[in-house]
Regions:
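Post-DEXD/H (motif II) to motif III coupling segment of the RecA-like Helicase ATP-binding lobe
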Residues: 141-201
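Conserved helicase ATPase core of P-loop NTP-dependent helicases/translocases
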Residues: 77, 93-100, 264, 275-340
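Conserved helicase/translocase motor-coupling segment
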Residues: 223-292, 315, 319-328
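Conserved interdomain linker/interface between the two RecA-like ATPase lobes of SF2 helicase motors
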Residues: 180-256
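Conserved pre-motif I regulatory segment
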Residues: 4-41
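Walker A/P-loop
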Residues: 34-55
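Conserved RecA-like P-loop NTPase helicase motor core
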Residues: 284, 314-403, 408, 412
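Conserved Walker A/P-loop ATP-binding site and its immediately adjacent core
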Residues: 50-51, 60-85, 259-260
Length: 550
């Protein structure tokens, strides 16, 4: 072990924030309690790399050896740079590394490289005999499953770090590899303290996703199937229109469905004269099919050639090498960068002011990784803007909303678990409404459906009129043949009639909640919830909505 690594007198260039020290102390407490495999959760931009570098710095002088695992080159370099700020000189294990420098006390390994070495006796012996602490960056991804399945970490101290400890579908459950979770502060707290910036979310509509296929392994939308729904002129025009209206000249990162979709999006923005590029993995030239192959294979080959030629032409005009494109994006004022999922993690560019989700996802992990790219504090940046073209915020919640994380993913009994949202100044029937305060026109940002005062612009919703909503309305209930069977006011309806009327009129859940609350408050609402077998989450959302409204 080098004296440089051992020296406790070397002052690091980084001082931990209070909440980061709290996370470190909670982690130490859990380890003392006997839990050796811990998942540490902290929002994107909260300083996970700083925390685990601090832990490594404190462990090395005690004779401990630390192995840090990551899955991307950017993360490798980022971790290496932060460790250097803590006066640690790590040994890098990446492509081409054939030997281990046993003199070192800290190692950073590309997971893909270690995977290729893991079956070799000398590498196994090194992990078993020398490594004391294993730190895993972006621990939620499945790339690291093999190291747990190997059994080499069974008796090691393992600390997994991620902003999104969540898996779904048929993925290996995190609870198989981690015993407990250490939770850091939520996004809302970090925003309030000035460590992250606030997000202004605009719901830009979404194409129908009813016919989009879902990947059974990831439980998320299939890329090519989704692209067919998003490859439409009105959506390309919508991105340009919203950018020009709300954030002209600001630096924007756009996420698309697939490479062709990313290229077409870049072309549309380039037509308007904006500085725009796309970045993607290099697309290889298709191989010619064998002689005598089926007509289907020939047709598929022709389609692949067409896509390759489109990519090649666009690559020369609107892209380039990954490093050069990212350098251009960093240095160019008002630059717009289009990608698919290449920049969801390990990409740190604080100057990003706008995130555009030109796609949909069912994955909370992917959703937060994408929008988290805009959350970092930078110079005079007070907030970042999210343009949501995939209904993601309605499906998964806003950036600041509290998230429930767990090591085991279980199917929910009902509801999405996401509080209902609304556009500021817009009614449930998508019509503008005049504010009752000084601000007469809403800002159209997404806000909680339960609030009557917009926290962004100060728009105040007019007070509802209970008499107008209930006493003066008559509801007509018809049987299966369309024959009228009852006409009565809402407050006199029984539960079956009220539920049936709502279904006939296709009213929202919020409409039903209001009727129940006005005629009997929380007690009436909970009684109906019991009658209709609502889940606990749905009941709580309904109560929260009504408490904020009335």
């Amino acid at each position: 072990m080098s004296s440089h690594e051992n020296s406790k007198n070397n002052m690091s260039k980084i001082i931990l924030r209070d909440y980061q020290l709290s996370v470190v102390n909670e982690t130490r407490k859990r380890l003392k309690d006997g839990f050796n495999h811990l998942m540490v959760q902290l929002p994107t931009g909260g300083g996970k790399t700083i925390i685990f570098s601090y832990i490594a710095q404190n462990a090395i002088p005690k004779g401990k050896k630390v192995l840090i695992l990551t899955d991307r080159d950017e993360l490798l370099k980022q971790a290496g740079g932060t460790l250097s700020d803590f006066n640690i000189n790590p040994y890098f294990i990446k492509a081409g590394a054939k030997i281990i420098d046993h003199r070192k006390s800290c190692f950073i390994a590309m997971s893909q490289t270690l995977r290729k070495r893991i079956d070799k006796p000398d590498w196994q012996k090194w992990i078993l005999d020398e490594i004391d602490i294993v730190i895993i960056d972006e621990a939620h991804i499945q790339e690291f499953n093999y190291i747990f399945e190997s059994g080499l970490l069974d008796n090691k101290m393992v600390l997994g770090f991620t902003a999104t400890p969540s898996r779904s579908g048929k993925m290996r459950q995190l609870g198989l590899d981690y015993e407990r979770m250490v939770r850091g502060p939520q996004v809302k707290e970090l925003v309030s303290k000035g460590f992250l910036v606030n997000c202004d979310t605009y719901d830009c509509g979404s194409p129908s996703l009813d016919n989009v296929s879902v990947n059974s392994q990831t439980n998320d939308y299939n890329y090519s199937s989704m692209a067919k729904q998003f490859d439409k002129p009105n959506l390309y025009a919508g991105l340009v229109k919203n950018y020009e209206k709300y954030t002209p000249g600001q630096k924007m990162l756009v996420f698309c469905c697939n490479v062709d979709h990313a290229i077409k999006t870049a072309i549309e923005l380039a037509k308007k004269g904006y500085p725009v590029k796309f970045v993607s993995s290099r697309r290889a030239k298709p191989k010619e099919p064998e002689i005598g192959c089926t007509e289907g294979k020939i047709q598929k080959y022709k389609e692949s050639v067409k896509a390759y030629e489109f990519y090649k032409e666009s690559y020369d005009q609107l892209s380039g090498g990954r490093k050069s494109v990212l350098k251009w994006f960093k240095e160019t004022k008002g630059a717009i960068l289009i990608n698919v999922d290449m920049l969801t993690k390990g990409f740190d560019e604080p100057s990003i002011e706008v995130i555009a989700l030109n796609r949909a996802t069912k994955s909370m992990t992917l959703y937060l990784q994408m929008i988290g790219r805009g959350s970092r504090v930078f110079k005079d940046k007070l907030n970042f803007t999210l343009f949501d073209f995939g209904g993601n915020a309605q499906r998964l919640g806003t950036y600041e909303s509290n998230k429930e994380w767990g090591l085991w993913h279980e199917e929910k009994k009902g509801g999405s678990g996401v509080p209902p949202l609304k556009e500021c100044g817009i009614t449930s029937k998508s019509k503008p409404i005049t504010g009752s305060g000084e601000v007469k026109k809403g800002c159209k940002r997404l806000i909680m459906a339960s609030v009557s005062l917009c926290p962004f612009c100060g728009f105040k919703y007019p007070e509802p009129d209970p008499a107008k909503e209930i006493d003066l309305q008559l509801a007509e209930i018809k049987d299966a043949n369309g024959v009228s069977i009852k006409v009565k006011s809402f407050k006199l309806m029984n539960y079956y009639e009220l539920k049936t009327y709502r279904q006939i009129k296709e009213h929202t859940s919020a409409w039903l909640w209001r009727q129940l609350w006005i005629r009997g408050g929380e007690k009436e609402l909970r009684a109906f919830a019991n009658y209709d077998n609502w889940s606990g989450g749905t009941t709580q959302r309904a109560v929260g909505f009504c408490r904020g409204k009335f």
